[in-house]
Amino acid sequence: GYRAGAPFMRGYAPTSIPANGAYQTAALATDANALHEKLGGNSDAVIIGHDWGAPAVYGAAILEPARWKTVVGMSVPPWGAMGNAFISNLNQVQRSWYMFFFQHGLSDFVVGANNLAFIDMLWDQWSPGFSADEDIANAKATIATPEHLAATLGYYRATLGAGFRDPALNEAQSLVQGENPPQPLLYLHGENDGCIGTEVARDAATRAPSNARVEIIQGAGHFMQLEQPAKVNKLIVNWITSNAS
């Protein structure tokens, strides 16, 4: 069998707020590698990430490739596909409007208002038709305080805006932005994802190296692991098994 760990990412309750306020992707990747070390992982370990977890696992695999046997990313594609979409795909720019809105201080108040109704709106758009009351409540609990909400918005500000970037991570940041994971990589994307369009995933497939695979999950939106858990789990287990030798 497998031993699995599912951590809360930095800044999401119940984790503490990072003292230096660093939420850049290199910081997320470094956290993942530190967790591997803390748990006593070896080179057979597999790293899996969804949404913000996806660039975190790509970065972890790039920075310390000896730690990870294979990589699984979901809902945010690798291989430069997102950067290309922001430049050449206006439909995706429109879908990603919230990322630009989050650069403004007003977003702290708007997102936090009315029992975080902003989150309900995003879920409705990203996974249309999926009833997720319990999952949404759990998500809201991780950003229920102003401090934790500001931390999560800090991810977007460090990526696209003027958010803090730790100078000590400059070299690591350049690597995670400019390189690709060398390990075998499985990328999964929901066919009804309203956050990132399937055309972005298909573009990623054209950029994928020979040791990678892209799968579009039928009947699923952005939160495919909740919407189609049996399909997603089967694909992941089969991928891990096929790359175990």
What residues fall within each predicted segment?
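A short, Lys/Arg-enriched amphipathic alpha-helix followed by its capping loop at the start of a domain
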Residues: 1-2
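Flexible "cap/lid" subdomain of the alpha/beta-hydrolase fold that forms the substrate-access gate
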Residues: 5, 12-48, 52-212, 216, ...
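Catalytic active-site module of serine/aspartate enzymes centered on a nucleophile-bearing elbow/loop
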Residues: 211-245
